[in-house]
């Protein structure tokens, strides 16, 4: 992308001044009876400045030449749709970054690139982080987290999303502050980091390129992680490949979830390695859940829950205990999400879910009662 040499507002000022000067010089020439040579040179000089301003006027976001002089077009780039005037760009935007749960998760063979083939049905839930983006004058991009994160800001997936967006979209003329308010537990299999990154991409679209499509954002999201493309649209989807190939599914019927995050954590790489070492595993599939979604049958969906990672839990894991506790407290069914360690239970009624959550919260402080979204 070529960087803008003259911004829209400057080009417009130059063009207006050029026109005014040409009119003034034309009038003076007539009044003072100056030579035609003077008039001609004045007009040529003014037109030269005018044309240069038009030719070198580029979109501040995508860097493409705007082709037409600014007085003869609207205030939006014809290529990317970004506002061309500073005061038309929003200064900040707030996005919800919702968590997900895996209704099914089947891990297949390991691919040559090191990833595993997977088949999973994911659905968004009402537990969310809040991501706010602010445009600032710099001198650099910033990440502010509450609570603070231990990793370097540059390694955070939100900052990587920022770099991917502008690497694909084009140069930016200012800097961005990302404020991240965390609620989703980490190392839980709830996709919190991936959802935050997707929220950054959506927010940058609002700030800089309002006509960018979800498909374009999903292509960027693929560079950030297997789960990130899902969070661009959310809802309910079947993911295959390494998780990036998405097929939209019918919405989940209305229901409530109790999500429990115990203190234990399961490194994703270690869980995949455990599956690779397993002599035999049942290998679940998504057929029952897909059929239940088609009929909007919550009981059928609950009956079809499965997750291959539950077969290779470390010894002494609290996951089976939590799963059984949720069932005893009225959940239609319960299981671990992702590679863990969060567990969720499905409930028809909010009241039943709230009672179960209040009981489990005594032993597991990170317990949440949320709707499906």
Per-range role (PLM):
Residues 1-54:
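Long, charged N-terminal interaction/targeting segments
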Residues 59-62, 77-80:
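Short cysteine-rich clusters marking metal-coordination/redox-active sites
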Residues 66, 84:
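Cys/His-rich microdomains that often coordinate metals
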Residues 67-76:
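Short linker/helix segments within small regulatory modules
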Residues 90-188, 206-215, 252, 261-264:
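ATP-binding N-lobe of GHMP and related small-molecule kinases
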Residues 174, 197, 201-238:
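Contiguous, small/hydrophobic- and glycine-enriched helical/loop subdomains that border
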Residues 179-208, 226, 331-347:
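Glycine/serine-rich anion-binding loops at beta->alpha junctions
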Residues 233, 238-333, 348-354, 358-361, ...:
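Conserved, helical-rich catalytic subdomain that frames metal- and/or nucleotide-binding sites
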